[in-house]
Amino acid sequence: MKRLTFGACICCLLSLMACSQKAKQVQIPEYDKGINIIPLPMQLTESDDSFEVDDKTTICVSAEELKPIAKLLADKLRASADLSLQIEIGEEPSGNAIYIGVDTALPLKEEGYMLRSDKRGVSIIGKSAHGAFYGMQTLLQLLPAEVESSNEVLLPMTVPGVEIKDEPAFGYRGFMLDVCRHFLSVEDIKKHIDIMAMFKINRFHWHLTEDQAWRIEIKKYPRLTEVGSTRTEGDGTQYSGFYTQEQVRDIVQYASDRFITVIPEIEMPGHAMAALAAYPQLACFPREFKPRIIWGVEQDVYCAGKDSVFRFISDVIDEVAPLFPGTYFHIGGDECPKDRWKACSLCQKRMRDNGLKDEHELQSYFIKQAEKVLQKHGKRLIGWDEILEGGLAPSATVMSWRGEDGGIAAANMNHDVIMTPGSGGLYLDHYQGDPTVEPVAIGGYAPLEQVYAYNPLPKELPADKHRYVLGAQANLWAEYLYTSERYDYQAYPRLLAVAELTWTPLAKKDFADFCRRLDNACVRLDMHGINYHIPLPEQPGGSSDFIAFTDKAKLTFTTSRPMKMVYTLDETEPTLTSTPYTVPLEFAQTGLLKIRTVTAGGKMSPVRRIRVEKQPFNMSMEVPAPKPGLTIRTAYGDLYDVPDLQQVASWEVGTVSSLEEIMHGKEKITSPEVLERRVVEATGYVLIPEDGVYEFSTENNEFWIDNVKLIDNVGEVKKFSRRNSSRALQKGYHPIKTIWVGAIQGGWPTYWNYSRVMIRLKGEEKFKPISSDMLFQ
């Protein structure tokens, strides 16, 4: 049975209302009141007038080229309001019409427009067709959010009276999707393009090749997709997918119809393992390669000393460039280790022959060769800020991701720059809430407010260099985006903040008002089936779903942006009518708290289930003649998680002095071929220094104390601990057990963790490792 999305449910409900209550007065939802445009226009004046679109309204355009814009508008109104508006070409009508025209003499930027609405109708005049399109998108946002519904709704399509003069602060407003670590279907890509267009994002940066996969068909090199698009994951399953050139053309045209330029990225000279798996001879030291199944940076890269590599690069560009009519072509250029080049006689010869003093200059040489091929196709090169190292290609545009320094340096060299620093909140794969309650992510912390606050013009950049900052871009890397819904969750609503910071004048930005307008925008996202992030209730200082206490417990909750929370204490699921959370909750007895967040549109977050348990101090044990350390037993074989331990036939027994020794310390794993699959179970005692309630945290598979399984990470991608738990403990020795399984789970090798267990006494701010002087056997 297929799961209905929240948006689909809303549409069905509104459709039923439309059928059964046509003649009844409908109350306008709070989120539809007021002006809710994102991004906020440069100038907006309200009036008391309004205009209602009805079945006699016409859409008039000044030229044939504007008819596709009118059709997009008409299609929306037909689906949501059952209005079949006629599209005509001609002068602006006197009344009951929506007029869309172009005036190249408008004193605005190319994408600017003017919009006027009053009781006679709506007039949209763009500086260009781009501007007319964005004016149409603004009109849609002046209408109720339900205009985005694919089913008829019972709401008047009323446009408030306004005069708008608008243009973007920046010409480049971008969104990058990584489809290599994980894959998105053509329909999923189009869904994101629809949302980008709605909020005036005009560049789609498509990351198509990586160590983990090659995702675009190259007819001259069929093995790039035959071999390079499929990898065998750590659990033995296969993951694959690629786009045919015909599908690429379809997506590019779909984007173009919505005034979005698609920029392809073909990574070079690093992040090339999928290509090397298909054609090993492109490496410095050919061997049998496979697409990388762990994240991070691969040491094997394209050989810069082989002429055949540059012929390959030229051939690939020759096929890819014609598929993308836009000006820019992204060649990556980031995170390219130089170890193989240093050891390669051909690379060293290339350096000597061309007077290159080091491998950084060799990378610059590589990039410049690619630039020459791109210029043949009339393309301009974009690269990540590493392309600055060793000398910048003459016409290169720099995408500054490692902070702003690269962008500042490039702008000071009179090179165009696109700002996209993770430190500025523009890496949407970063956490947007407490990592202990959010789905696993790559790390970092970029809540909505931080994203919104970013200014693409660094204070350190002289004013006369501002013109080189083309704009900013949000990047969505996909290491931990295991489903298309997870792409949605990480991207929205933060991408809307990026839309506003790149369009709206800095002086007009207002986060509180943005959040108000976001209530309306989220309903629009519902209509498109977007699984956007709803802030979860969080506990300051670190969230936990199991709270032990000895006397009383007080639980305080916040959200990463202001949201209503509701809860229950009777084990029922919280609903819209459940008790609102307004003050900290106090517990004197054991109980189960269920709490969730509610949006203005009535959508609810997942439920947090928090067990609050009153405990006596669990008694310590007498341990005769305790010795330092822990007893361990180790098994080797095809083991993936704790349930696999049942098949272990033999164990090796030993001892360790610390928890970190369980896995020999944090291991540097650069390739899955060197992984030694094993499981380690450690048992012994922990010496608790004083009576108290202690909270524990670990990335190990399991942690037990007093023969109680306190933390169970089975099934989790164990990059960060998400199952912290507490227990009331008496001073003295308590039996413990922890299990660590060495495996690759969701692309993350557990060998990259520390096998330690963290502890903190209630009231302490920070965790600390259980140290060796606390461990006994």
From Swiss-Prot:
Signal peptide residue numbers: 1-18
Organism: Porphyromonas gingivalis (strain ATCC BAA-308 / W83)
Entry's Gene Ontology cellular component terms: cell outer membrane
Gene3D superfamilies xrefs: Chitobiase/beta-hexosaminidase domain 2-like (3.30.379.10), Glycosidases (3.20.20.80)
Alphabetized UniProt keyword annotations: Cell outer membrane, Glycosidase, Hydrolase, Lipoprotein, Membrane, Palmitate, Signal
EC numbers, comma separated: 3.2.1.52
Record keyword Flavoprotein present: no
Catalysed reactions, semicolon-separated: Hydrolysis of terminal non-reducing N-acetyl-D-hexosamine residues in N-acetyl-beta-D-hexosaminides
Name of this protein: Beta-hexosaminidase
The protein's enzyme class: hydrolase
Lipid moiety-binding residues (S-diacylglycerol cysteine): C19
Biological classification of the source: Bacteria, Pseudomonadati, Bacteroidota, Bacteroidia, Bacteroidales
GO molecular function, one term: beta-N-acetylhexosaminidase activity
InterPro entries per UniProt: Beta_hexosaminidase_sua/sub, Glyco_hydro_20_cat, Glycoside_hydrolase_SF, Hex-like_dom2, HEX_bac_N, PA14/GLEYA, PA14_dom
